[in-house]
């Protein structure tokens, strides 16, 4: 009973930390994200063989990089993504068959591509491979399809990506999880990139309906013309 209680408390603490991360990400609170990332990094250093601890650190760094990217701070993206990659690589090394660990690794690889041209091509391929493996391991992962869609959004069609592929990925993510505000957010961005502004606004509005606290979604809706 005592072991069960300890396990339950550890899981609950993990959920609480994830919730704190999401709230800080939603309000673009980089100071809070930096603190949470530091705490997660300290925890993983004390548990080198705990894949979940490394994963939690990777997620924290990825959220920090995400907000830095939203605010166009390339230096901060690099500073967050690099340690995040190390954490995610360690999680994958310990448990290579966990799809979510592969997904967050692929996401972090993708986040660093725009800020480091020298390694961009190499990391871009690593990102694609890692996310493809995540989908292979868990074909019903909505998050993995969002991650693949983000990659396709940024990669030109001539290099195997493109906005049309991205839209299909985001639509698949929504099919798998109709309550994914992240999928609707990125669907809106892809629709706007395709000059389909009315559909973009509809997707942004749905994303905000699901998650009213996401500052970046509000910003994207405000800057999208009605037609």
Locations of regions flagged by a protein language model:
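Helix-start (N-cap) detector for alpha-helical repeat units in TPR-like alpha-solenoids
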Residues: 51, 99-100, 142-143, 181-182, ...
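Glycine-centered coil turns and helix-coil junctions that link the paired helices
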Residues: 64-71, 112-119, 148, 152-159
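Structural signature of tandem alpha-helical TPR/SEL1-like repeats
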Residues: 30-35, 71-86, 118-133, 159-172, ...
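N-terminal leader/linker segments that initiate helical-solenoid repeat arrays
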Residues: 10, 14-71
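Terminal, low-structured helical/coil segments at or just beyond the last alpha-helical repeat
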Residues: 164, 181-227
């Amino acid at each position: 009973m005592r072991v069960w209680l300890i396990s339950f408390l550890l899981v609950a603490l993990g959920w609480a930390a994830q919730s704190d991360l999401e709230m800080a990400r939603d309000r673009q609170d980089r100071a809070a994200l930096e603190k949470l990332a530091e705490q997660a990094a300290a925890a993983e250093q004390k548990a080198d063989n705990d894949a979940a601890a490394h994963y939690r650190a990777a997620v924290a760094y990825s959220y920090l990089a995400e907000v830095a990217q939203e605010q166009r701070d390339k230096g901060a993206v690099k500073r967050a993504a690099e340690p995040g990659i190390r954490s995610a690589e360690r999680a994958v090394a310990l448990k290579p068959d966990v799809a979510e660990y592969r997904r967050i690794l692929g996401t972090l690889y993708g986040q660093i591509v725009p800020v480091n041209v020298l390694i961009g091509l190499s990391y871009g391929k690593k990102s694609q491979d890692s996310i493809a493996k995540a989908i292979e391991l868990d074909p019903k992962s909505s998050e993995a399809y969002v991650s693949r869609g983000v990659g396709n959004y940024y990669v030109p069609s001539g290099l195997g990506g493109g906005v049309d592929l991205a839209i299909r990925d985001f639509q698949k993510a929504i099919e798998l999880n109709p309550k994914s505000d992240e999928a609707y957010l990125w669907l809106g961005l892809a629709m706007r990139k395709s000059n389909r502004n009315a559909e973009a606004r509809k997707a942004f509005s749905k994303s905000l309906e699901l998650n009213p606290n996401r500052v970046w979604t509000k910003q994207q809706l405000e800057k999208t013309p009605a037609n």
